[in-house]
Design a protein with these regions (language model features):
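Structured loops at beta-to-helix junctions and adjacent beta-edge loops in soluble globular domains
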Residues: 58-60, 117, 241-243, 253, ...
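Acidic, proline/glycine-rich low-complexity IDRs
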Residues: 135, 142, 291-331
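Short, well-ordered strand-loop elements centered on a beta-strand within folded domains, enriched
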Residues: 65-68, 113-114, 254-267
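Nuclease and nuclease-like effector domains acting on nucleic acids or nucleotide cofactors
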Residues: 1-102, 106-147
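Short, surface-exposed beta-strand/loop micro-motifs that present aromatic residues
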Residues: 104, 239, 247-253
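A surface-exposed partner-binding patch
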Residues: 143-247, 306, 319-331
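Compact, glycine/acidic-enriched structural inserts
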Residues: 261-297
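Short, solvent-exposed loop/turn segments at secondary-structure junctions
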Residues: 108-110, 120-122, 190, 244-248, ...
Length: 331
């Protein structure tokens, strides 16, 4: 089990902020979350003031990999809150996460907290995944019996994003979007999978709306949000969605333009002192040669997720618990 402890032995990313409050550098998040995020003495972020729900989950079984842990924890936490009748889960499936929210593993514990997606993305960090006693070199999850395609909740209008709006984005970015993603953005920008999509090879739960194009600055605007993610990605990559446990990004410059990558949060492989360039070279995980290939990898609402999550909740291995005091969210 030594692999599960590697993340605890090295200084976490952004360790220099230990014991300090980190404020959001952009105006939208700074206005919504003026109190920032406190980093504890060990360099782990304390997102508790922003938590809207919390779940305690049992210790993982022997031999679990980090992708298995992240996925099982997320769907079990959602199932526990769904079973508890929490209002945020009224409009999503039993194992999906409410839109605009993501699960955070609290460092050194088996507590999970539901926090706003844009808060979790403030900076690279170590927390409860990096400190978990699992195999951090073991990737992927168990194969599914059947791979059903993922479906998106498309708008009733003909397009989500107009050609004119896409051209405006490209003008702002300084390059043409990769073709497969460009077509997707026009058809389904701002849309989310119906229920949840799963990338089995990486255990990535895709249950949040993809970014879109907005007339005003917003954390779901493709151009604006990428300005907020410079601790995670170089400008060779364009983030297109928040997913459970990290970011989904496209390669937009250099080699393999259009390829799709997963940038995990709370990654035991991450180290303090690395540049953003070093992080993308060492930490990003491939999940499709282009955006069409990525979508084809996704399994739509695999029943295995609900089965596992139900067993966790029914067996008392995942249960909702009270949240701590909340920080006011403005705007």
């Amino acid at each position: 089990m030594t692999t599960g402890r590697l993340g605890q032995q090295a200084a976490p990313p952004n360790a220099a902020y230990s014991g300090q409050v980190v404020h959001f550098p952009d105006p939208v998040r700074a206005a919504r979350h003026p109190h920032g995020v406190r980093m504890d003495a060990d360099g782990h972020p304390d997102f508790s003031p922003y938590a809207r729900a919390a779940v305690e989950i049992a210790e993982p079984p022997e031999g679990f990999g980090v992708d298995e842990l992240r996925l099982t924890d997320c769907v079990s936490a959602n199932a526990a809150m769904h079973a508890a009748g929490h209002a945020l889960w009224d409009t999503v499936g039993p194992v999906a996460t409410p839109h605009g929210w993501t699960w955070h593993h609290v460092a050194g514990t088996r507590r999970m907290e539901l926090v706003p997606v844009e808060v979790k993305a403030l900076l690279r960090h170590h927390a409860g995944l990096a400190t978990a006693p699992v195999d951090h070199g073991k990737r992927g999850t168990r194969p599914l019996q059947e791979l059903r395609p993922v479906h998106l909740g498309l708008p009733k209008t003909v397009v989500s994003v107009s050609e004119e709006a896409v051209q405006g984005v490209e003008e702002d970015l300084g390059y043409r979007l990769p073709e497969a993603y460009r077509a997707f953005l026009k058809a389904a920008g701002g849309c989310a999978p119906v229920g949840a999509g799963l990338d089995v090879d990486l255990g990535v739960l895709v249950d949040q709306p993809f970014f879109t194009v907005r007339e005003e600055a917003a954390v779901n605007d493709l151009v604006y949000v990428n300005k907020c993610l410079r601790d995670h990605l170089t400008k060779d990559y364009l983030c297109v969605a928040f997913v459970q446990g990290g970011l989904l990004a496209l390669k937009v410059k250099g080699e393999a333009i259009g390829s799709v990558w997963f940038s995990p949060y709370d990654d035991a492989r991450d180290r303090d002192g690395w540049s953003v360039q070093e992080r993308v070279e060492r930490l990003l995980l491939p999940c499709g040669a282009d955006f069409d290939a990525f979508l084809e990898r996704l399994a739509g609402n695999p029943p295995e997720l609900e089965t596992v999550a139900g067993l966790m909740v029914d067996g008392g291995f995942a249960r909702s618990v009270p949240v701590s005091g909340a920080a006011p969210v403005e705007g």
